[in-house]
Protein backbone atom coordinates (compact mmCIF):
# COMPACT_ATOMS: atom_id res chain seq x y z
CA UNK A 1 0.00 0.00 0.00
CA UNK A 2 2.87 2.35 0.80
CA UNK A 3 4.32 1.86 -2.68
CA UNK A 4 0.93 2.71 -4.21
CA UNK A 5 0.75 5.89 -2.08
CA UNK A 6 4.24 6.95 -3.19
CA UNK A 7 3.38 6.20 -6.82
CA UNK A 8 0.15 8.22 -6.68
CA UNK A 9 2.00 11.06 -4.93
CA UNK A 10 4.49 11.15 -7.81
CA UNK A 11 1.63 11.97 -10.22
CA UNK A 12 1.57 15.51 -8.86
CA UNK A 13 4.82 16.19 -10.68
CA UNK A 14 3.44 15.00 -14.03
CA UNK A 15 1.08 16.72 -16.43
CA UNK A 16 -1.26 13.69 -16.17
CA UNK A 17 -2.05 13.87 -12.45
CA UNK A 18 -4.81 16.44 -12.80
CA UNK A 19 -6.31 14.57 -15.76
CA UNK A 20 -6.33 11.31 -13.80
CA UNK A 21 -7.98 13.11 -10.88
CA UNK A 22 -10.70 14.55 -13.12
CA UNK A 23 -11.41 11.19 -14.77
CA UNK A 24 -11.52 9.40 -11.41
CA UNK A 25 -13.84 12.02 -9.86
CA UNK A 26 -16.18 11.90 -12.85
CA UNK A 27 -16.26 8.09 -12.96
CA UNK A 28 -16.70 7.69 -9.19
CA UNK A 29 -19.86 9.80 -9.22
CA UNK A 30 -21.57 7.63 -11.79
CA UNK A 31 -20.12 4.13 -12.15
CA UNK A 32 -16.67 3.58 -10.55
CA UNK A 33 -16.26 2.30 -6.96
CA UNK A 34 -13.03 4.13 -5.95
CA UNK A 35 -13.46 7.64 -4.44
CA UNK A 36 -11.18 10.44 -5.66
CA UNK A 37 -10.14 11.57 -2.17
CA UNK A 38 -6.89 9.55 -1.96
CA UNK A 39 -5.68 10.85 -5.33
CA UNK A 40 -6.81 14.39 -4.48
CA UNK A 41 -4.91 14.17 -1.20
CA UNK A 42 -1.81 12.80 -2.92
CA UNK A 43 -1.81 15.49 -5.59
CA UNK A 44 -2.40 18.23 -3.01
CA UNK A 45 0.44 16.89 -0.86
CA UNK A 46 2.69 16.78 -3.92
CA UNK A 47 1.97 20.42 -4.82
CA UNK A 48 0.33 22.14 -1.81
CA UNK A 49 0.15 25.49 -3.63
CA UNK A 50 -2.18 23.90 -6.21
CA UNK A 51 -4.49 22.32 -3.61
CA UNK A 52 -7.42 24.65 -4.22
CA UNK A 53 -7.12 24.18 -7.99
CA UNK A 54 -7.17 20.40 -7.50
CA UNK A 55 -10.21 20.74 -5.20
CA UNK A 56 -12.06 22.83 -7.80
CA UNK A 57 -11.23 20.33 -10.54
CA UNK A 58 -12.39 17.41 -8.40
CA UNK A 59 -15.61 19.20 -7.49
CA UNK A 60 -16.45 20.10 -11.10
CA UNK A 61 -15.67 16.60 -12.40
CA UNK A 62 -17.58 14.96 -9.56
CA UNK A 63 -20.69 17.08 -10.14
CA UNK A 64 -20.50 16.38 -13.88
CA UNK A 65 -20.17 12.66 -13.10
CA UNK A 66 -23.19 12.97 -10.82
CA UNK A 67 -25.19 14.53 -13.65
CA UNK A 68 -24.15 11.60 -15.86
CA UNK A 69 -25.20 9.17 -13.11
CA UNK A 70 -28.54 10.96 -12.80
CA UNK A 71 -28.99 10.63 -16.57
CA UNK A 72 -28.13 6.93 -16.51
CA UNK A 73 -30.63 6.35 -13.71
CA UNK A 74 -33.36 8.36 -15.43
CA UNK A 75 -32.74 6.85 -18.84
CA UNK A 76 -32.14 3.22 -17.95
CA UNK A 77 -34.69 2.56 -15.20
CA UNK A 78 -37.56 1.86 -17.58
CA UNK A 79 -35.42 -0.87 -19.22
CA UNK A 80 -35.00 -2.76 -15.94
CA UNK A 81 -37.95 -1.83 -13.74
CA UNK A 82 -39.99 -4.94 -14.51
CA UNK A 83 -37.01 -7.18 -13.76
CA UNK A 84 -36.61 -5.52 -10.36
CA UNK A 85 -40.33 -5.68 -9.60
CA UNK A 86 -40.61 -9.36 -10.58
CA UNK A 87 -37.30 -10.82 -9.35
CA UNK A 88 -35.92 -8.72 -6.49
CA UNK A 89 -37.56 -9.44 -3.13
CA UNK A 90 -39.03 -6.33 -1.52
CA UNK A 91 -39.00 -4.28 -4.71
CA UNK A 92 -42.50 -3.61 -5.96
CA UNK A 93 -44.24 -0.71 -7.65
CA UNK A 94 -45.64 0.19 -4.22
CA UNK A 95 -42.27 0.16 -2.44
CA UNK A 96 -40.76 2.07 -5.36
CA UNK A 97 -43.44 4.77 -5.04
CA UNK A 98 -42.88 4.96 -1.27
CA UNK A 99 -39.10 5.45 -1.64
CA UNK A 100 -39.67 7.88 -4.50
CA UNK A 101 -41.90 9.94 -2.20
CA UNK A 102 -39.18 10.01 0.47
CA UNK A 103 -36.60 11.03 -2.12
CA UNK A 104 -38.91 13.77 -3.35
CA UNK A 105 -39.48 15.10 0.16
CA UNK A 106 -35.85 15.00 1.29
CA UNK A 107 -34.11 15.32 -2.07
CA UNK A 108 -31.63 18.04 -1.10
CA UNK A 109 -30.63 16.38 2.17
CA UNK A 110 -30.25 12.90 0.70
CA UNK A 111 -27.89 14.14 -2.00
CA UNK A 112 -26.11 16.58 0.31
CA UNK A 113 -25.33 13.92 2.93
CA UNK A 114 -24.34 11.35 0.30
CA UNK A 115 -21.99 13.83 -1.34
CA UNK A 116 -20.36 14.81 1.92
CA UNK A 117 -19.84 11.38 3.49
CA UNK A 118 -17.88 8.27 2.50
CA UNK A 119 -21.11 6.65 1.28
CA UNK A 120 -20.84 5.51 -2.36
CA UNK A 121 -22.05 8.67 -4.11
CA UNK A 122 -22.85 6.87 -7.36
CA UNK A 123 -25.62 4.89 -5.64
CA UNK A 124 -27.35 8.17 -4.85
CA UNK A 125 -26.74 9.84 -8.22
CA UNK A 126 -28.15 6.84 -10.09
CA UNK A 127 -31.13 6.54 -7.74
CA UNK A 128 -31.77 10.30 -7.97
CA UNK A 129 -32.29 9.80 -11.70
CA UNK A 130 -34.37 6.68 -11.17
CA UNK A 131 -36.65 8.52 -8.73
CA UNK A 132 -36.66 11.65 -10.92
CA UNK A 133 -35.89 14.07 -8.10
CA UNK A 134 -35.80 17.78 -8.87
CA UNK A 135 -32.76 18.19 -11.14
CA UNK A 136 -31.75 21.76 -10.10
CA UNK A 137 -31.97 20.69 -6.44
CA UNK A 138 -29.81 17.66 -7.26
CA UNK A 139 -27.16 19.83 -8.93
CA UNK A 140 -27.22 22.40 -6.11
CA UNK A 141 -26.88 19.75 -3.38
CA UNK A 142 -24.10 18.07 -5.36
CA UNK A 143 -22.17 21.33 -5.85
CA UNK A 144 -22.41 22.28 -2.19
CA UNK A 145 -21.64 18.88 -0.69
CA UNK A 146 -18.91 17.82 -3.09
CA UNK A 147 -17.38 21.29 -2.99
CA UNK A 148 -17.39 21.29 0.79
CA UNK A 149 -15.85 17.83 0.95
CA UNK A 150 -13.07 18.48 -1.55
CA UNK A 151 -12.32 22.10 -0.62
CA UNK A 152 -11.98 21.19 3.07
CA UNK A 153 -9.41 18.56 2.12
CA UNK A 154 -7.66 20.91 -0.30
CA UNK A 155 -7.75 23.76 2.22
CA UNK A 156 -6.21 21.63 4.96
CA UNK A 157 -3.35 20.64 2.70
CA UNK A 158 -2.95 24.19 1.40
CA UNK A 159 -2.66 25.50 4.95
CA UNK A 160 -0.69 22.68 6.60
CA UNK A 161 0.79 20.85 3.59
CA UNK A 162 4.27 19.93 4.81
CA UNK A 163 3.15 19.20 8.38
CA UNK A 164 0.23 17.11 7.10
CA UNK A 165 2.48 15.21 4.71
CA UNK A 166 4.89 14.51 7.56
CA UNK A 167 2.05 13.20 9.74
CA UNK A 168 0.79 10.97 6.94
CA UNK A 169 4.28 9.68 6.25
CA UNK A 170 4.79 8.88 9.95
CA UNK A 171 1.35 7.33 10.49
CA UNK A 172 0.61 5.95 7.03
CA UNK A 173 -0.62 2.55 8.21
CA UNK A 174 -2.97 4.10 10.76
CA UNK A 175 -4.46 6.44 8.15
CA UNK A 176 -4.82 3.53 5.72
CA UNK A 177 -6.77 1.53 8.31
CA UNK A 178 -8.98 4.50 9.17
CA UNK A 179 -9.75 5.14 5.49
CA UNK A 180 -10.47 1.44 4.92
CA UNK A 181 -12.80 1.30 7.91
CA UNK A 182 -14.67 4.41 6.73
CA UNK A 183 -15.01 2.94 3.25
CA UNK A 184 -16.37 -0.38 4.56
CA UNK A 185 -18.71 1.50 6.92
CA UNK A 186 -20.05 3.51 3.98
CA UNK A 187 -20.82 0.35 2.02
CA UNK A 188 -22.38 -1.23 5.13
CA UNK A 189 -24.69 1.75 5.65
CA UNK A 190 -25.85 1.54 2.04
CA UNK A 191 -26.48 -2.19 2.43
CA UNK A 192 -28.49 -1.59 5.61
CA UNK A 193 -30.58 1.12 3.95
CA UNK A 194 -31.70 -1.25 1.20
Give short role names for the model-derived ranges.
Residues 2-3:
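Selected transmembrane alpha-helices and immediately adjacent juxtamembrane segments
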Residues 52-97, 101, 105:
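Membrane helix-loop-helix hairpins that form the core translocation module of multi-pass transporters
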Residues 75, 189-194:
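Juxtamembrane and boundary regions of transmembrane helices in multi-pass small-molecule transporters
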Residues 6-59, 101-169, 176, 180-186, ...:
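Hydrophobic alpha-helical membrane segments of integral membrane proteins
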Residues 11, 79-95, 161-174:
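Membrane interface segments of multi-pass transport proteins and intramembrane proteases
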Amino acid sequence: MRRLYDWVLSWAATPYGAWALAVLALAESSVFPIPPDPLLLALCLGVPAASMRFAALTTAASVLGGVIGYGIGAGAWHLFDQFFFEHIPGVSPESFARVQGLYGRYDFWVIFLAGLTPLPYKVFTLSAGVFAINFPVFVLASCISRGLRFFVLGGLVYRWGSALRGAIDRHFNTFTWIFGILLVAGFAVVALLR
